Design a protein with these regions (language model features):
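Hydrophobic faces of well-ordered beta-strands that scaffold small-molecule active sites
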Residues: 80-84, 103-105, 132-136, 168-170, ...
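Glycine/small-residue-rich loop that forms an oxyanion/phosphate-binding "nest" at active or ligand-binding sites
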Residues: 124, 130-184
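Active-site mouth loops of central-metabolism enzymes
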Residues: 76-87, 137-152, 173, 199-209
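C-terminal alpha-helical cap/extension of soluble enzyme domains
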Residues: 140, 248-326
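Glycine-rich phosphate-binding active-site loops on the catalytic face of alpha/beta enzymes
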Residues: 104-113, 159, 163, 169-175, ...
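Active-site-adjacent beta->alpha loops and helix N-cap segments on the catalytic face
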Residues: 90, 109-128, 174-191, 207-212, ...
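Glycine-enriched alpha-helix->loop->beta-strand junction motifs that scaffold or abut catalytic
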Residues: 98-103, 128-130, 164-167, 193-195, ...
Length: 326
């Protein structure tokens, strides 16, 4: 590996401070070389295909964290971690203030969570220190996608990672409710080519055989699975969660979610042995313009037909405190 450093001074509105520009050249995936350079706490990476006679040099830039910081935060993920399901920039701010380490960033939570905008992701990364796992999901309902929908997902995946997402949550199933090995393998490989985490979301809970599914995901190199133990709520699925953690917890991260709150987090973690919990920490906010004369834009039934859901900073803090009392 070749490394060069150049010290210089950088002028910001807040003042002048010393920093360095470093260059690293080392082997990358698929026989490519990877050139990285770092300025302060921001790292940019350029992947270049090997030159062939008469070929052009292709490359792309993407914003990354420093390698040391990333290693530190990835180590934290293997410890006790609270992940908050967020549907907006505002939700992410509440999660950060409440003490969350990581969020799953979505849009359209009323549909189970769809792909967030790149603008929302950039705002979260700019204004918080949260690890962000971005949802990649083009529509509501299930997880068996057409070719056009799949193409959209891969395009969105690249955009999200190029805008700083620390990982992606996704799920591909076949019509017989098995993991789609081809699409899942391609997505996992793409995510890992950016050095990010590949998270298979609760599509796992719709699979016909969870043992077969988790073994296939391990074989494909997935980093983590979000699951409720194939039940509506994680408490109801705690037996399967416990079994999966005991059998596979050393080979893949398990993240327990659905119905997790301050009242049950500690008991759920102790019973299952799972050290990562996923929660919405939701409360309802009224928007009186939701229902008009003959028009109704409600996303929830009564008594919340004029409400939308938000992340509660208080509930996040209570969850974090309860979980860390273990």
């Amino acid at each position: 590996m070749l490394q060069k450093k150049l010290k210089f001074w950088y002028d910001k509105k807040q003042g002048v401070f010393p920093c360095f520009l470093s260059f690293r050249k080392h082997p990358g995936p698929s026989g490519r070389e990877r050139l990285t350079y770092a300025l302060g706490r921001v790292v940019k990476e350029r992947n270049t295909h090997d030159r062939q006679p008469g070929s052009r040099l292709f490359g792309k830039m993407k914003i990354l964290k420093t390698e040391e910081r990333k290693r530190d935060r990835m180590a934290e993920n293997r410890e006790m971690t609270i992940e908050i399901c967020c549907g907006s920039y505002e939700d992410a701010l509440a999660a950060a203030r409440g003490g969350a380490e990581r969020i799953e960033l979505n849009s359209a939570l009323a549909l189970g969570g769809l792909t967030p905008s790149a603008a929302c992701l950039r705002m979260v990364k700019r204004c918080t220190d949260l690890l962000v796992v971005s949802m990649v999901r083009p529509r509501g309902a299930g997880f068996c996608y057409t070719e056009a929908q799949t193409e959209q997902m891969f395009e969105e995946a690249r955009e999200l990672m190029e805008n700083g997402s620390d990982g992606l949550a996704f799920g591909f199933l076949t019509e017989d409710r098995c993991v789609d090995l081809e699409k899942t393998g391609r997505m996992t490989e793409l995510i890992h080519s950016y050095g990010r985490e590949a998270v298979f979301h609760r599509a796992f809970d719709c699979t016909e055989d969870p043992v077969r599914a988790i073994e296939e995901l391990i074989g494909l190199g997935a980093d983590r699975i979000l699951t409720s133990g194939q039940q509506e709520k994680a408490e109801q699925g705690k037996e399967l969660l416990r079994q999966l953690q005991a059998a596979y917890g050393s080979r893949i991260q398990l993240l327990a979610g659905s119905g997790v709150n301050a009242g049950n987090a500690r008991a759920l973690a102790e019973y299952t042995g799972i050290r990562q919990l996923h929660s919405s920490c939701r409360y309802w906010e009224r928007d009186v313009t939701t229902v008009g004369e003959g028009v109704n834009y409600s996303i929830a039934p009564a008594p919340h037909e004029r409400d939308y859901d938000r992340v509660s900073e208080r509930l996040v803090r209570e969850l974090a405190e309860a979980f860390r009392e273990r």
